[in-house]
């Protein structure tokens, strides 16, 4: 009975709170024009409020049919073309004062070699933490949280089973004591029926 009472509010909370989540995520993904930010129109905390963007004509309609319901078609937002191209092309002569080395000797002099290459064998594994998002192929039972939960759940289950068996044995003994004990005197004794004749 208790799990059913707890299940109903949990389902209500999960199903009732679910529609609120997508609304917030849609609002967070609205696009802000980066050109407006670069031109300095808005400062920190002074960005336009999304709720104030709508016109007040939506609130003027009464819904009783008094006014004309036709709305003017709203134009689609214009696509802003970026001033800087979005490709990765870097011009060859980006800065006239810097010369790119082209000979093999110059390339070898400019090469940076790491002091110690990381190797997988023989390293100290004490500082390497296995993240759950990176351990894709690992077994679920290798994680300590899962093992601890399984052990605690098993202990609680075994204790519950032992107490249930003890309760059944106790009730059986109590029932057996009353039904087979013939040496006891009855609690109620029938009064003798003596008849007197006149």
Curated annotation (Swiss-Prot):
Residues 171-198 are cytoplasmic. Residues 42-76, 94-130 are annotated as: Disordered. Keywords: Glycoprotein, Heparan sulfate, Membrane, Proteoglycan, Secreted, Signal, Transmembrane, Transmembrane helix. Shedding is enhanced by a number of factors such as heparanase, thrombin or EGF. Also by stress and wound healing. PMA-mediated shedding is inhibited by TIMP3. O-glycosylated; contains both chondroitin sulfate and heparan sulfate. Ser-44, Ser-62 and Ser-64 can all be modified by either chondroitin sulfate or heparan sulfate, and the protein exists in forms that contain only chondroitin sulfate, only heparan sulfate and both chondroitin sulfate and heparan sulfate. Coiled coil: none annotated. The chain crosses the membrane at residues 146-170. Glycans are attached at residues 44, 62, 64. Residues 24-145 are extracellular. Residues 48-71 have a biased composition (Acidic residues). Residues 102-118 have a biased composition (Basic and acidic residues). InterPro entries: Neurexin-like, Syndecan, Syndecan/Neurexin_dom, Syndecan_CS. Ubiquitous. Highest levels in liver, kidney and lung. GO terms for biological process: inner ear receptor cell stereocilium organization; negative regulation of T cell proliferation; neural tube closure; positive regulation of exosomal secretion; positive regulation of extracellular exosome assembly; positive regulation of focal adhesion assembly; positive regulation of stress fiber assembly; regulation of fibroblast migration. It is found in: Membrane; Secreted. GO terms for molecular function: fibronectin binding; identical protein binding; protein kinase C binding; thrombospondin receptor activity. Disulfide bonds: none annotated. Cell surface proteoglycan which regulates exosome biogenesis in concert with SDCBP and PDCD6IP. Belongs to the syndecan proteoglycan family. Homodimer. Interacts with CDCP1 and SDCBP. Interacts (via its cytoplasmic domain) with GIPC (via its PDZ domain). Interacts (via its cytoplasmic domain) with NUDT16L1. Interacts with DNM2; this interaction is markedly enhanced at focal ahesion site upon induction of focal adhesions and stress-fiber formation. PANTHER family: SYNDECAN, SYNDECAN-4. This is Syndecan-4. It comes from Mus musculus.
């Amino acid at each position: 009975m208790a799990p059913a009472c707890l299940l109903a509010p949990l389902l209500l909370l999960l199903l009732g709170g679910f529609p609120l989540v997508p609304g917030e995520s849609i609002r967070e993904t609205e696009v802000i024009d980066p050109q407006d930010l670069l031109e300095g129109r808005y400062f920190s905390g002074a960005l336009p409020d999304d709720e104030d963007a709508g016109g007040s004509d939506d609130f003027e309609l009464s819904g009783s049919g008094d006014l004309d319901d036709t709305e003017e078609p709203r134009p689609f937002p214009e696509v802003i073309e970026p001033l800087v191209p979005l490709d990765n092309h870097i011009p060859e002569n980006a800065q006239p004062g810097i010369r790119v080395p082209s000979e093999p000797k110059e390339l070898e002099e400019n090469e940076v070699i790491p002091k110690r290459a990381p190797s997988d064998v023989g390293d100290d594994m004490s500082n390497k933490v296995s993240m759950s998002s990176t351990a894709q192929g690992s077994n679920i039972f290798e994680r300590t949280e899962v093992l601890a939960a399984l052990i605690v759940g098993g202990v609680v289950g075994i204790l519950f089973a032992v107490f249930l068996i003890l309760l059944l044995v106790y009730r059986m003994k109590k029932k057996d004591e009353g039904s087979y004990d013939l040496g006891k005197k009855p609690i109620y004794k029938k009064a003798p029926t003596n008849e007197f004749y006149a």
